[in-house]
Amino acid sequence: MTSSAAAIRLGFEPFVNASPVELRTNWSDSDVQAVISATYRQVFGNEHLMLSERLTSAESLLASGNISVREF
């Protein structure tokens, strides 16, 4: 079984099918949340983390524009 087939069987979409997410100029709060979710999904393999596992200070800095997505 391939990893894509296993991902589908387990109920989540493989990364191959995910489109790139960018944070461009004049972003909205929903854009920031989409980037944060995509980052958690790519780095941790899961965007649904427990509250204690979330990087709340980094999320806040990103949402306020104090750091870039790369720095996040």
UniProtKB/Swiss-Prot annotation:
Q: Which PROSITE patterns does the UniProt entry name for this protein?
A: PBS_LINKER
**Annotated compartments:** Cellular thylakoid membrane
Q: Name one GO biological process term.
A: photosynthesis
Of the GO CC terms on this record, one is: plasma membrane-derived thylakoid membrane
Taxonomically, which superkingdom?
Bacteria
UniProt xrefs under InterPro entries: PBS_linker_dom (IPR001297), PBS_linker_sf (IPR038255)
Q: How does it sit in the membrane?
A: Peripheral membrane protein
Looking at the record, the residues that make up the PBS-linker domain are 1-72
- Keyword field: Antenna complex, Membrane, Photosynthesis, Phycobilisome, Thylakoid
Question: Which Pfam family, just one, is annotated for this protein?
Answer: PBS_linker_poly
Similarity comment text for this entry: Belongs to the phycobilisome linker protein family.
Q: Could you tell me which PANTHER family the record lists for this protein?
A: PHYCOBILIPROTEIN APCE (PTHR34011:SF6), PHYCOBILISOME 32.1 KDA LINKER POLYPEPTIDE, PHYCOCYANIN-ASSOCIATED, ROD 2-RELATED (PTHR34011)
- General function of this protein: Rod linker protein, associated with phycocyanin. Linker polypeptides determine the state of aggregation and the location of the disk-shaped phycobiliprotein units within the phycobilisome and modulate their spectroscopic properties in order to mediate a directed and optimal energy transfer.
What protein am I looking at? Phycobilisome 37.5 kDa linker polypeptide, phycocyanin-associated, rod
Identify the species of origin.
Pseudanabaena tenuis (strain PCC 7409)
